[in-house]
Amino acid sequence: MFDQFFSQISFVDIFNICVLLVFTICYTYQFFYIFEVLVHRHKGLKAKKNHRYAVVIAARNERAVVGNLIHSINVQNYPQELIDVFVVADNCTDDTADVAREAGATVFKRTNDKEVGKGYALDYAFQIIRSQYADRKYEAYFVFDADNVLDVNYFREMNKTFDNGAKASTSYRNSKNYDSNWISAGYAVWFLREAKFLNQARLNLHTSCAISGTGFFISADIIDAAGGWKWHLLTEDIEFSVSSILNGVRIAYCPTAVLYDEQPTTFRDSWNQRERWAKGFYQVFWNYGARLVKGMAANPKGHRFACYDMLMTIAPGMLLTIISVIFNAIIIALGATGAMSTGTVVASSVSSIIFCLANYMLFMFVNGVLTTFVEWDSIHSTTGRKIRYMFTFPFFMLTYVPIALVALFHNTQWKPIRHTIDVGVEDIAEQSAKIENSRF
């Protein structure tokens, strides 16, 4: 029976089975993550002391939104004398600096067209703060994007995490424009999934989380030891996360500290941003992949699984999908031109491509539905739109396939993303109140 079975398997079948096995073996643990989050709840923390923090905001032509972020910091349920806000007006051609200064921030103007990117702006700010404001003895630095808005209890909740010993921590990343269109909704669902089914699970299991762009703090000890912000790949956040894990630093997660982020609404902006992310992930993989593999065996106990988890996060899994699709497409093309006469092999390739794409879409649909229902009350939108965007989410994720392919060959550069959604902390509080009242 087995002889007959194996005699009917072509080299195309063997290739596709191997790809499927690799994916299954590598990522099955994330299904356990989902189970962990649905079954167990993380106990809340308490703080014995309020700590002193510096906020660093890198802003490039962000006059339309930076004032809302600073205002949301100024109205925090946390002692204002323990928070100082610093804005880096990075290569601005508008009045971002004036708007930030009027809102109460200390502003540093930076002009440098050679070293472009958020990481360089952060390092510029850290160098000034550490040299000119050392007497204020900041215990940690918070990093936000200029388009963010914070829940009024954000600092109070993050302070609990810091007071309990965390050297770095990310927070709950919500979106302030989920219902702009299917693109912004796609981003929003992805970040909610990342918060709930990745970082929450990691927190429960006492392994390391990962920071993601904005809404995190880093202990001043780490910045001082590094001499500033020294992570300058296209995805400096992931590079920092990997570097921290390799050095035995566990990144925490605070699910009760809520941040609202603005998502792109045009496909062009979305393409540019996600191409940068894809290229950045490739860069981190090439620079740190081997060290993560080594860390899976050599790191101290309690930090080894974090190396594996982060390796799976940055490993170009999408690239493996692309290779599989291209391989099968070549087989189909050879069959269509008559260069390959084995009809069963060509048929196998056709079915494999359909199977691959259908399974990818189904997997993303299930993820979108699960995330939307579990986080239903956190999504500020109508029931109809929430349901509609469950069905568009798989198509949003499918667009990652060509983006990841282009990023592999294109000399991707950092490009600014325009932010124009004028939403303040009071607007978000009003939306939350409406959702709360609708339950009764």
Language model regions located:
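N-proximal low-complexity "stem/linker" segments adjacent to membrane-targeting elements
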Residues: 1-72
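Juxtamembrane C-terminal module of membrane proteins
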Residues: 32-50, 291-310, 333-440
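Acidic helix N-cap motif at the loop->helix transition within catalytic regions
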Residues: 67, 94-101, 109, 118, ...
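A conserved acidic beta->alpha catalytic loop
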Residues: 89-97, 112-114, 149
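Long helical/loop segments within the catalytic core of UDP-sugar-dependent glycosyltransferases
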Residues: 111, 115-134, 152-234, 275-278, ...
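Short beta-strand-to-loop acidic/aromatic patch adjacent to the donor-nucleotide binding site
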Residues: 133-149
